[in-house]
Curated annotation (Swiss-Prot):
The lineage of its organism: Eukaryota, Metazoa, Chordata, Craniata, Vertebrata. It comes from Aquarana catesbeiana (American bullfrog). It is found in: Secreted. This is Pro-opiomelanocortin. The modification Phenylalanine amide is found at residue 87. Keywords: Amidation, Cleavage on pair of basic residues, Endorphin, Glycoprotein, Hormone, Pyrrolidone carboxylic acid, Secreted, Signal. GO terms for biological process: neuropeptide signaling pathway; regulation of corticosterone secretion.
Length: 263
């Protein structure tokens, strides 16, 4: 009773495998192991053959599709096109060298499927951090290269100092070789301050006298100490008008108004 049931179960499993194989179906039936399906051993051998053909012909996707690590050759074929496939001293930083996780390679990780599952996320994070650091380093190097042509790209300690140029004998001779008329024109171009001789004498007398400690020092020898006498008050008040006191003007106006009212 049990043999027909067991035989039917095995045939059902074989049918499921053959249905999923698809293109490999003809290869399973053509193999020598699938010729004898009358016994249980022949059916099991046929199932193993179909399973081997299925694993060999099915497309390989990167990742843990069957909860098993891929073989090393397939991993190299899949990941050899990317730069982050390489591990070891070239891509490890100083921080990774301090830790013990910097020297792992794909062969070591592939031998331990459990470590491959748990360390996948850590390796991905470290790879992203390394790529960000490399990008920042490249950006800094490019910036230093592009900014070295400008004055503000250099450090503060290296300031540009003015170059002292000493006149040579040839320049002195060239200045003496100017004609007299050109020298006069050059001298007329300068703006000399207009000062009165009387004011200079007064200022000279004040400077020669002793300066007391209690008084403030007045800078009479500068132009901005005070305007000349003829330019004070905007020039509209002449000395004649300034001699008339303000009170006399008010008195004269009041007297004139009184005479007009009396008349």
């Amino acid at each position: 009773m049990l043999q027909p049931v067991w035989h039917a179960c095995i045939l059902a499993i074989l049918g499921v495998f053959i249905f999923h194989v698809g293109e490999v179906r003809s290869q399973c039936w053509e193999s020598n192991k699938c010729t004898d399906l009358s016994s249980e051993d022949g059916i099991l051998e046929c199932i193993k053959a179909c399973k081997m053909d299925l694993s060999a012909e099915s497309p390989v996707f990167p990742g843990n599709g069957h909860i098993q690590p891929l073989s090393e050759n397939i991993r190299k074929y899949v990941m050899s096109h990317f730069r982050w496939n390489k591990f070891g001293r070239r891509n490890s930083t100083s921080n990774d060298n301090n830790n013990n996780n910097g020297g792992y390679k794909r062969e070591d990780i592939a031998n331990y499927p459990i470590l491959n599952l748990f360390l996948g996320s850590d390796n991905q994070n470290t790879q992203e951090g390394i790529m960000e650091d490399d990008a920042l380093d490249r950006q800094d190097s490019k910036r230093s290269y592009s900014m070295e042509h400008f004055r503000w790209g250099k450090p503060v300690g290296k300031k540009r100092r003015p170059i002292k140029v000493f006149p040579t004998d040839a320049e002195e001779e060239s200045s003496e070789s100017f004609p007299i008329e050109l020298r006069r024109e050059l001298s007329l171009e300068f703006d000399y301050p207009d000062t009165n001789s009387e004011e200079e004498l007064d200022n000279g007398e004040l400077l020669e006298g002793p300066v007391k400690k209690g008084r403030k020092y007045k800078m009479h020898h500068f132009r901005w100490e005070g305007p000349p006498k003829d330019k004070r008050y905007g020039g509209f008040m002449t000395p004649e008008r300034s001699q008339t006191p303000l009170m006399t003007l008010f008195k004269n106006a009041i007297i004139k108004n009184a005479h007009k009212k009396g008349q």
